[in-house]
From Swiss-Prot:
Quaternary structure annotation from Swiss-Prot or TrEMBL: Heterodimer. The active hormones thyrotropin, lutropin, follitropin and choriogonadotropin are heterodimers composed of CGA, a common alpha chain described here and a unique beta chain which confers their biological specificity to the hormones: TSHB for thyrotropin, LHB for lutropin, FSHB for follitropin and choriogonadotropin subunit beta/CGB for choriogonadotropin.
Source organism of this protein record: Saimiri boliviensis boliviensis (Bolivian squirrel monkey)
Location, primary (coarse class): secreted
PANTHER family, sorted: GLYCOPROTEIN HORMONE ALPHA CHAIN, GLYCOPROTEIN HORMONES ALPHA CHAIN
SUPFAM superfamilies referenced in this protein's UniProt entry, alphabetically: Cystine-knot cytokines
GO molecular function: follicle-stimulating hormone activity
Protein name: Glycoprotein hormones alpha chain
GO cellular component: extracellular space; follicle-stimulating hormone complex
Residue positions the entry lists as glycosylated: N80, N106
Record's subcellular location: Secreted
Function noted in UniProt: Shared alpha chain of the active heterodimeric glycoprotein hormones thyrotropin/thyroid stimulating hormone/TSH, lutropin/luteinizing hormone/LH, follitropin/follicle stimulating hormone/FSH and choriogonadotropin/CG. These hormones bind specific receptors on target cells that in turn activate downstream signaling pathways.
């Protein structure tokens, strides 16, 4: 019975040390900061010319999962992994003219939706 108390004490000490270390880390230490949320960001290149031009930047979700066998049967080139994703795109925009005659889209609202143009 005495040996169980020793094991319980060791486990409690280990757990309390682990929790202390976990709480002492800065907030968001384990989150990826490479890809911010989907939002409007000023385009510095086109905004130099007077009128601020905004575009949607950031990340949405993507996931991959094994392709079901019945779906693989219908594929011309069967693939073992299926992936889905959504991209940060403009929900609303206005047309703007910069540099005299170049027409660009000035995004006014962003959301996550179907990816039309993939970056490699």
């Amino acid at each position: 019975m005495d040996s169980y108390r020793k094991y319980a004490a060791i486990i409690l000490v280990t757990l309390s040390v682990f929790l202390h270390i976990l709480h002492s880390l800065p907030e968001g230490e384990f989150t990826t900061e490479e890809c911010p949320e989907c939002k409007l960001k000023e385009n510095k290149y086109f905004s130099k010319l007077g009128t601020p031009i905004y575009q949607c930047t950031g990340c949405c979700f993507s996931r991959a999962y094994p392709t079901p066998f019945r779906s693989q049967k219908t594929m011309l080139v069967p693939k073992n992994v299926t992936s889905e994703s959504s991209c940060c795109v403009a929900k609303a925009y206005t047309k703007a003219t910069v540099m005299g005659n170049v027409k660009v889209e000035n995004h006014t609202e962003c959301h996550c939706s179907t990816c039309y143009y993939h970056k490699f």
